[in-house]
Amino acid sequence: MEHIITPKVENVKLLNRYTEKKSALGTLYLTATHLIYVEQTSNTRKETWVLHHHILSVEKLLLTASGCPLLIRCKTFQHLHLLFQKERDCQDVYQSLLRLFQPVKEEELYAFLYNPHQNEEERRRGWELISVVNDFNRMGLSNDYWEISHINKNFEMCSTYPSILGLPKSASVATVTGSAKFRSRGRLPVLSYYHKDTKAAICRCSQPLSGLNSRCVEDEQMLQAISQANPNSPFIYVVDTRPKLNAMANRAAGKGYENEDNYSNIRFQFQGIENIHVMRSSLQKLLEVCSMKSPSMSDYLTGLENSGWLRHIKSVMDAGVFLAKAVCEERASVLVHCSDGWDRTAQVCSLACLLLDPYYRTIKGLMVLIEKEWISFGHKFSHRCGHLDSDPKEASPVFTQFLECVWQLSQQFPCVFEFNEHYLIEIHDQVYACQYGNFIGNCQKERLDMRLHEKTFSLWPHLLENQHQYRNPLYRRSLESTVLRPSTLPLHFKFWCGMYNHYDRGMHPKQSVLDTLLTLTQRQVEGERTMTELQRQLAVADGVLPDPAGPINTHADQNNQSEKMPAPPVVQSNGSCAPLINGNVKEVGPGAENSNQEDREEPAANEHDLSSKDKPVFVETEHSKEEVQESS
């Protein structure tokens, strides 16, 4: 609170970027964790809550005849354009926010203050909810070819890797140690995913320190061990996710990529995904297009094309599809790396896992995938998300791109994902919120040093407790398949309005056919549940038992039978849910009965209509529960 100069400012106008007529007048509050704007109207009271950690930038604009404007941009793509009557108030809020949204130390992050009213046992169980070892066991490890190793238990071999690794059983300790020394930052080749049916594996690492002509016998033996761990293929793919020109430039700096002359039985492949700086610039250009007030169609489409954003999404998707096809169709193992193996490598490996394994398309499965491929393998969340006041050139929307790839897949396969887009958006918001400890720090070792398991809480129990909000009513377990084969033709990539225009209240609400279908299926399930309950109450009142062969049970039996239909081996992207989308909403996917009906007319998720003006108001947001007492 010592950083807050003025905790309350009245008569602040919240401007609407689409039309001046819809601008609001209200009171601005600053707390230790949130900026709160209370909009006063004749009939309702709306509150907009913005977590300080969500703020990307605060810009004080030139003084105008109407007042002093302040523009707040958020990492969640929310914009607040405030207009103060007094320049002094604007300056005080500006100075306060500069200190509040850019903490210097990890201990100042929200997670170290937040308490969801859990005891220590609940906290411990929350952190143990997701286990990478359990996921390895689910894949079938340990087996004749792969083993779970504790060789990095003290992080001495690689400080940015997890303490538990999947390694080829035939690789000796000397081979593993020598390979680690030959790889950038010690990030040696280790197991990411094992396909039990084809016995092919996806492995990940960083670039070799090969330079122009260096080689390492142990590293060559390591790749040979990976190849021998798959009896169904005589070779492995080595996939460098970088553009070839970038990889060649790194060779001059003593790094680079594998020389095929030195490694037996490898097939090398470049994928051409750009670096973090290009991606950061691309997103900035995309957001500039989104912030245009009244663009022409030509300007909008030109701006979208010039941003290159969807082109980059396609590049990541192409690489993931290549890995999935290699593992599933060619039955070949794949080794993936970029420069350090914690950005593009994480994107591609996790996307391939999602295509290959239906478990990762469930609500809990996606948590496991993020924990395994991103958190434990050292994606630098604190740097990439700008949690602290650090080098802005380290920030990049790498994880945002992965979430968008998942969303793009859900658009092609609307019935094979247990979760909806709100789940992806919630995860994205929580990554930047720092409300929970999962995404604080850059690697597992840093998190242990900060004792996050003792001082903060895990996000995953919170998401599971509220999973009814994130269920996809179209999800059909009967459509689970071994592998997804999405089309990566340009026409299949869409602009994700739900993410980048999530907070734009000025946009005209337009429901898609899918949204309408979701609403209808949810209403149907709610109606059936109500009818079942009324039937039960009537039977109790009459003193008889409900008829087990009644219409409700018959309908439920029909649904159960439909869910037991055999699944096809592969789901193509051309209309897996065509019967439902064409109007047949009779069948409802599992979990739909837990879905809440959405009202598209309601304001954004962090706005609340409150009618009470004199008594304390309890406001529950997606990031906190706080009590606000309005002075009379």
Swiss-Prot record:
Residues 126-500 form the Myotubularin phosphatase domain. GO terms for biological process: blood vessel development; phosphatidylinositol 3-kinase/protein kinase B signal transduction; phosphatidylinositol dephosphorylation. Keywords: Hydrolase, Lipid metabolism, Nucleus. It is an enzyme of class 3 (hydrolase). It holds the Pfam family Myotub-related. The keyword Heme does not apply. Residues 545-632 are annotated as: Disordered. CDD domains: PTP-MTMR8. It comes from the Eukaryota. Phosphate binds at S339, D340, W342, D343, R344. PANTHER family: MYOTUBULARIN-RELATED (PTHR10807), MYOTUBULARIN-RELATED PROTEIN 8 (PTHR10807:SF36). Homodimer. This is Phosphatidylinositol-3,5-bisphosphate 3-phosphatase MTMR8. It comes from Danio rerio. The gene is mtmr8.
